[in-house]
Regions:
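Hydrophobic "anchor" residues
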Residues: 40-41, 116
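Compact, glycine-rich, soluble single-domain proteins
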Residues: 46-60
Length: 136
């Protein structure tokens, strides 16, 4: 469960950062936000590249920003895509979420707006995962 106020803060943050999306190739803007320790929120947008393969998804931008500033534990994730549809994280981003999530029940908020969103648990969108726990 996630507190509704925090959930709405995450959605606001993801919608705001989506404006900075650099996506001239797909024309698909994505914004993401994550909740870390101290109730701090990091956000990020997708950043594409002429080589396509060097593009970075919004979720990973937000996560890498947080980790590189010392926040390694994710308590919640929010993703807001474009057009009136729900945008789910790609496989690579799901794997990166597994690496830093507090646990498998971390809420993943898939939002279109403050009024229209779905909350999943990380484990729902990455069942049968391979993670660092397998290496211990
Ligand atoms: N994208 C994201 O940033 N996050 C997702 O969850 C799905 C896809 C980006 C990658 C690329 O820049 C564009 O959306 C189209 O795939």
């Amino acid at each position: 469960m996630i507190d509704e106020k925090v959930c709405l803060q995450l959605i606001d943050s993801a919608i705001k950062v989506r404006d900075y999306s650099y996506s001239p190739y797909s024309n698909f803007k994505v914004g993401a936000s994550i909740l870390v320790d101290d109730f701090k929120i990091f956000s990020g947008c997708n950043i594409e590249n002429a080589s396509y393969g060097a593009s970075n998804c919004a979720e990973r931008t937000a996560i890498f920003k947080a980790v590189s500033e010392g926040y390694k534990v994710i308590h919640a994730v929010c993703v807001v895509g474009s057009f009136d549809e729900f945008t789910y994280p790609c496989g690579i981003c799901r794997q990166v979420m597994l690496e830093f999530a507090l646990n498998n029940s971390v809420p993943i908020i898939i939002a279109q707006s403050r009024e229209n969103y779905i909350v999943h648990k990380l484990n729902d969108i990455v069942p049968f995962e391979f993670s660092k726990n397998n290496l211990i």
